[in-house]
Amino acid sequence: MSSSKPVTPRNDRRQNSGRRHSHRSSGIQLPSMSPKVHHYPIDAENLPMDSPEIVEKFASLAESMETLDLHMHDLCHIHDHISNQFNESFASFLYGLSMTMWCVDFPGCPSREQWEALISKRERKERIEVLKKRLADAQKLNDRLKLRLSDEAKQKPQQLTSQQRPTHGPTRQIKQQPRSVNFNTHSSDSISTNSYTSGDFNTNRRVSRIPQPSRSNLPSSRFQAPSKSGPNLNQPPRYMRGLFDGNNTLNTSNYSRIKKPIHNRSVNNLQNRPPFR
């Protein structure tokens, strides 16, 4: 059976390739079929892959490949030993530990001294912030106290000037001297009463602006009037004395002989009184 596919002539391909090679070897520049693509000029002395940047990149890539090959060889060696010489649970633990050891890397991890220095620096910053806040609060309190002190200093002179103004002259209270009444009797069986004092029963005290003379020269026999708030319970029994004598008779014969009370009240001399103002 004959194939339905046409046979590709091989001779033509060889001839075309040879012709193309012959054209290039002759130095003839073929026109570019894609004018948008930039082609480097062919220079035997300055090739694009021989530039220093490309050479450095290839050197770094070669070193990385060597390191990767070494790590993979060591990892395969560790995996083989763990899988063949340990049990399954412990082998899985060591396998995960080895994977973590090989895969996780912290090149920028700080040391212990650097970490402690970082923590102390952070604490110093926080302390500085707290001190700044306390200083601001103290400054505000100081300003408020200064303002309050200035207000009080302004109010004090006004109070002093108002207190220094004379309102009225000094007032003195007049104390009325009590009157002493003596009832003297001649006979022993008659009604006799001791001296009693009667003061002014007016509860309203008078206030005078006239300065009064000194009362230090009053006789010592006079004593102060009893209290106005209640009765005088220290009075002698005047009313019941003589009612019940030896003969149980009421003796009223001596009432006619009662003398008038003698007023020992000293009369103030008008000449000693200061002039009226």
Curated annotation (Swiss-Prot):
Disordered: annotated segments: 1-36, 147-242
Statement: the UniProt record of this protein carries the keyword Cytoplasm: yes
Keyword Cytoplasm among record annotations: yes
InterPro entries: DASH_Dam1
Disulfide topology: none
One GO BP: protein transport along microtubule to mitotic spindle pole body
Chain intervals with Polar residues compositional bias: 156-166, 173-184, 199-235
Coiled coil regions, renumbered to chain: 119-156
Keywords on record: Cell cycle, Cell division, Centromere, Chromosome, Chromosome partition, Coiled coil, Cytoplasm, Cytoskeleton, Kinetochore, Microtubule, Mitosis, Nucleus
Role, per record: Component of the DASH complex that connects microtubules with kinetochores and couples microtubule depolymerisation to chromosome movement; it is involved in retrieving kinetochores to the spindle poles before their re-orientation on the spindle in early mitosis and allows microtubule depolymerization to pull chromosomes apart and resist detachment during anaphase.
Protein name, per record: DASH complex subunit DAM1
Organism: Candida albicans (strain SC5314 / ATCC MYA-2876) (Yeast)
Gene label: DAM1
